[in-house]
Amino acid sequence: MKVTLIAILTCAAVLVLHTTAAEELEAESQLMEVGMPDTELAAVDEERLFECSVSCEIGKEGNKDCKKKKCKGGWKCKFNMCVKV
């Protein structure tokens, strides 16, 4: 009886692990298909850095601290400009 129970639980655990691994692989493959090439990502990062820097400078006018202007999308305000986190 114990052996049967152990075998059933082992099979269930293997099935769960296999299903989880398969889902992760499927998600990775979809990201690779939909994802942008590295050069396009770099261009987006440069544009975001420029936009955030300008936003921080605008927010700094009138003795306002740059940190009051919140940067979005994985960026934070540092050294009077937004930087990628």
Swiss-Prot record:
* Biological function: Postsynaptic neurotoxin.
Q: Which cysteines are joined by disulfide bonds?
A: C52-C66, C56-C77, C71-C82
Q: Which InterPro entries match?
A: Hwtx-2-like
Q: Where is the signal peptide?
A: 1-22
* UniProt entry keywords in alphabetical sequence: Disulfide bond, Neurotoxin, Postsynaptic neurotoxin, Secreted, Signal, Toxin
Which positions are cleaved off as the propeptide during maturation? 23-48
Q: In which tissues does this protein get expressed?
A: Expressed by the venom gland.
Q: Tell me the compartments it is located in.
A: Secreted
Highest taxon of the lineage: Eukaryota
Report the GO molecular function annotations.
Answer: toxin activity
Please report the name of this protein according to its UniProt entry: U4-theraphotoxin-Hhn1j
Determine if Signal is one of this entry's keywords: yes
Looking up Pfam families in the UniProt record yields: Toxin_20 (PF08089)
Q: Name one GO cellular component term.
A: extracellular region
Which family is annotated?
Belongs to the neurotoxin 12 (Hwtx-2) family. 02 (Hwtx-2) subfamily.
